[in-house]
Amino acid sequence: GGIGYQGGGCPPYIIHVIDSEWGYQHMGLIVQKFGGSSVADADKIRNVSRIITETYRRGHSVVAVLSAQGDTTDDLIEKAKEINPNASRREMEMLLSTGEQIACSLCAMAIEAMGYPVISLTGWQAGMRTNSNYSNARISRINTERIQNELDKKSIVIVTGFQGINKYDDITTLGRGGSDTSA
């Protein structure tokens, strides 16, 4: 597949056209990645939703990977420090993974309100398996069955970036820039 940028200056999103890399047989799959500034508020989420649905209307299967809104991750880190400056890495993973879940749910709700079939999935629901290196995990494998099943139902799939699950079923995060890795 190839990578293309749309937009001016620093791109608000990246589109990856995936062909056989994930084992999909059809050429119409487009994976779109949206960073935190592009989903920072309700208007921006609606704009992202329009971009996603426009791609879908053109006949493509769409998987969108979203980051947490704006400074959400930094805000969550600050809240954790207020409660426990020495919080365990596992508990930090639990907390930090929520930012992407919020963004994905809100985007799915916006797409749903526009009348399109959509489902949001966490990294682990999407089959992202990682090692146990908390806060800097690496993807060890991806089971794309759930994503493929949803695409086969003609749903738009919105996936949380930045996160997966390890062999102990603990949430892990991929570190800064992890949503790009997820895409």
Cite the ranges covered by each PLM segment.
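Short, low-complexity intrinsically disordered segments enriched in A/P/G/S/L with frequent Arg
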Residues: 3, 10-12
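Intrinsic structural disorder/low-complexity segments
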Residues: 9, 16-19
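Nucleotide/pyrophosphate-binding catalytic subdomain
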Residues: 18-183
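Ser/Thr/Pro/Gly-rich low-complexity, intrinsically disordered segments
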Residues: 1-3, 17
